[in-house]
């Protein structure tokens, strides 16, 4: 199977996984990226089974609306039953690196507000140690130099992501050459740097379930 076929398979698996949760008042959190887009397309086939969605980016909100799926502001809903999103990397503890699509802050907020976080990915994203994929850090623009210097002290090699402005009006530093042996500790350390909005480690609030598309089929990993 190609990577695109694996992504399609895991999007279908995610829809099958969450379908028993769907009721007339259910709110579904929806992530951002190529795999999340395929999940949105699957979700559209069942849009009569639930109330609506909360999206983690303007791009996902636009795709949902094109399918006729209601998109609510997070502040207008009481709870999110389940959040489905992809990842750039996952370890065996379901700690993730996310943010390749620059939506990490809103993704982290939606994940924090959700009863269950279902991560969907293909087998290439499962690693023993996080850090091969550069860690995105969303920053206040004026703090870029300061944050970069602090990230170097942590052992990383930060690179400014040229031409990218997040939905929140901020910039992204991608941090290379990190061997992330303690994801929770590093997430806290980076978030403690003045000028950082958040970073792409989802370790404090990790995924609850990882649906992993492999050439042998879908594997389900749980915490």
Swiss-Prot record:
Record keywords, A-Z: Isomerase
EC numbers on record: 5.3.1.6
Molecular function GO terms recorded: ribose-5-phosphate isomerase activity
GO-annotated cellular components: cytosol
GO biological process: D-ribose metabolic process; pentose-phosphate shunt, non-oxidative branch
Pfam families listed in its UniProt record: Rib_5-P_isom_A
Catalytic activity: aldehydo-D-ribose 5-phosphate = D-ribulose 5-phosphate
Tree of life domain: Bacteria
General function of this protein: Catalyzes the reversible conversion of ribose-5-phosphate to ribulose 5-phosphate.
Quaternary structure and interacting proteins, as annotated: Homodimer.
Protein name: Ribose-5-phosphate isomerase A
Protein species of origin: Marinomonas sp. (strain MWYL1)
